[in-house]
Amino acid sequence: MRKLFLSVMLAASTYVSACTNFIVGKDASADGSVICTYNADDYGMFINLCHYPASKNAPGTMRQIYDWDTGEYRGQIPEAAETYNVIGNINEYQVTIGETTYGGREEMIDPSGLIDYGSLIYLTLQRSKTAREAIKVMTNLVETYGYCSSGETFTICDPNEAWIMEMMGKGPNSKGVVWVAIRIPDNAISAHANQSRITTFNMKDKKNVIYSKDVVKFARSKGWFNGKDSEFNWNMTYAEPDFGGRRFCEARVWSFFNHFTDMTPYIDYAEGRVKGAKPMPLWIIPDHKVSLQEIEECMRDHYEGTPFALDNDIAAGPWDMPYRPTPLSFEVDGKKYFNERPTSTQQTAFSYVAQMRSWLPRQIGGVLWFGNDDGNMVAYTPIYCGNTVQPECYNTPGADAVTFSDKNAYWVCNWVSNMVYPRYSQMFPSLKVVRDSLEKSYFESQASIEKRALELYLQGDDVAINYLTDYSNETAQQMLARWRQLATYLIVKYNDMAIKPEKDGKFERTETGQGARVHRPGYSDTFKRQIAKFHGDRFAEPVE
């Protein structure tokens, strides 16, 4: 998503919306999958799970381009002769593309460019069979028709390779772009979170590094770089990290890496206060093979157990809420303060963990584990890459950003999560039980579902595709039904800041059939002490 940013010359930026991507190479994962993720974070954003069916198009067919963020019509381009099936951010060849916006130099934005970053993703998914082809398609499109967005980091993956590409325009009324794409080693993990991550790169490694021919020349022409080509540093030239870029953005990358290796040497960098602190590498080698379930947990991260944890300061409130309202920065009596910005955040519109597997037929190998809210507050459901119809709950007629529907996953999941946020430590355990039980059932069923799909595949790929489409849609609808039950359970269980007792999964009653006496837990001891410290004797009872 886009972030509002000030000039790179300012000491701090204002990050209003932001996203997070994690990447796992095939030899770094527990089962040989390439894995990548995307939290699409933006206040007020309402996005359906999109579907673009495969098509063959006559010469002269035109494709209309609408800005992905605003819906504004930008123009049209010739449609490809053939396009591939796309559902969400994965296509039928298991190519998956995500992004995070880092902004960079404002003077490099070209408002007249035809294609925005979001449109670029979905155009490319419809036209690419591999990650390398996707890089070629993306760069050709923006070089031909212009690029109107600010600096972007793209995750581009297929069943065999994972890449990071960073791109920026060349300024007003210029169709050109500068860009660098780097392949993540198969045994490594990487991440990006709204701060440019590419620094120096090996221009001689043609197999694993691809870049625009003028990536250095353009910087020289602007007076932004005058060293040797081999010394050229992408983000120090085009998007130098400031305090906000490090604390609000790079800290999320630090926390992800910290799950899989000791990141203590880089804590000064992530904290953002120490100038000249050693920056983090683009990738690390994890200390063990990483499972899909672990990556889902990383999408739910709030810096737990680190110096950046959100559940142990006064802003967590009485019930240890690891979420903070925005703006992230605020001012008190002329002094500026800030809140932490974790991976899991309330403004997530959708979240996915994509799984790409080279050893299976492509329509079976690609799975988008999808949720329509904050990853911490949803059960990810499987959407197979060849699916031809979205679940109704992820594409609900009549539901939108200002129209609630109890048939829509975004609204039902937000209904639940917004009950839980203010009383997190009390209510979240109830949500977690339901979430984890659903996901456990999906993972336990995956092998048998895919075994049956392989049997049907022998009868024809359409038979397997229809089977997986039906399975994905049924699973998503079952999740929605369970989440509606959870919503009504929570309002009964935790009504009026009290807790109703249960026995054997049922609310207890008295002998006369009335509801049993509720439990009133009050504040935690920690919060009581905070009240006493803040107010002194204001609420102290007199000693009799």
Regions found by a protein language model. Give the residues of each.
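Sec-dependent N-terminal signal peptides
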Residues: 3-13
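Active-site rim segments in enzyme catalytic domains, especially the processed small/beta chain
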Residues: 32-83, 315, 319, 325, ...
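Histidine-centered catalytic/metal-binding microenvironments
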Residues: 436-544
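Sec/Tat signal peptide C-region and signal peptidase I cleavage site
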Residues: 14-18
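Substrate-recognition/cap regions that form aromatic- and gly/pro-loop-enriched pockets
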Residues: 318-456
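A contiguous strand-loop segment
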Residues: 19-117, 137-290
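Glycine-rich, aromatic-lined ligand/substrate-binding cores of catalytic
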Residues: 218-371
